[in-house]
């Protein structure tokens, strides 16, 4: 009888193990189901992109002519910009040299440094005023007034 009791005891344990395995399998299937859903969602997203691409290929004839007209306008604008680039390069060459007094050599950050902009503007005007007067005299000589 002791053997029968052991077998009886062993059988419920085997059943419990099977139930646990079934529960675990269900959980795994549910997890895989969520994974399948995410992969299905990815497939849907890819599918949407493909559809969108197909729509881009099917352009009505009216819009094709409009795009061609816009392309012509863009080409004209590009030619105009190329002519102005030469003038901009000349303007950039006229820039004054960097004043070494404005360079901070301490290596520290300049945050919270109090700057008196009014004073700086006056100093710059005083320095540039001499240069401006020279330029104005040259311009006056080149410019002739016709009466």
Swiss-Prot record:
Keywords: Chaperone, Nucleus
Pfam families per record: CHZ
Subunit-structure text: Forms a heterotrimer with H2A.Z-H2B, stabilizing the association of the histone dimer. Also, with a lower affinity, forms a heterotrimer with H2A-H2B.
Biased segments, Basic residues type: 44-53
GO cellular component term of the entry, any: nucleus
Keyword Ion transport in annotation: no
Stretches with biased composition (Basic and acidic residues): 1-25, 33-43, 54-68
Keyword Nucleus attached: yes
Protein name: Histone H2A.Z-specific chaperone CHZ1
């Amino acid at each position: 009888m002791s053997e029968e009791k052991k077998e009886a005891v062993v059988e419920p344990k085997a059943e419990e193990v099977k139930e646990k395995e079934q529960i675990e399998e269900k959980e795994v299937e549910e997890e895989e189901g969520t994974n399948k859903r995410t992969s299905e969602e990815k497939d849907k997203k890819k599918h949407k992109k493909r559809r969108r691409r197909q729509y881009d290929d099917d352009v009505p004839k009216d819009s094709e002519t409009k795009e061609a007209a816009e392309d012509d306008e863009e080409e004209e604008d590009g030619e105009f910009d190329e002519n102005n680039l030469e003038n901009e390069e000349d303007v950039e060459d006229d820039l004054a040299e960097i004043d070494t007094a404005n360079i901070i050599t301490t290596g520290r950050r300049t945050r919270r440094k109090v700057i008196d902009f009014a004073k700086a503007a006056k100093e710059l005007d005083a320095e540039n005023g001499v240069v401006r007067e020279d330029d104005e005299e040259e311009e006056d000589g080149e410019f002739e007034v016709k009466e």
